[in-house]
Amino acid sequence: MSTGENIKRIRNIRGMTQKELGIAIGIGEESASPRMAQYETGNRTPRESMLNKMAAVLEVDPRNISIPTGYREEDMIYRLLAL
């Protein structure tokens, strides 16, 4: 999975909308949902500082967002929790 797919997966596990996550990391209310959609689809790449904010809000290690899935034991845990 890509960084964007990881953001979406973890956001969904946490039960947050794109807008809620965007606002929580400091994006303006009107821009929050479109910007998060850009990150999740890979049309825009979040800076490291933005990834760190997302990780803090989503309560995960930043590496869980930026490292491709399939390489971490945590991935299996998240997949199991999502069932």
Region spans (language model):
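Short, charged recognition helix plus adjacent turn
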Residues: 66-83
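Recognition helix of helix-turn-helix/homeodomain-like DNA-binding domains
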Residues: 26-45, 67
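Residue-level signal for the short linker/turn that defines the boundary of a DNA-recognition helix
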Residues: 2-5, 15-16, 31, 46-49
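DNA major-groove recognition helix of helix-turn-helix/homeodomain DNA-binding modules
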Residues: 43, 47-64
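Short basic helix-loop element that most often maps to the first helix and adjoining turn
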Residues: 5-26, 79-80
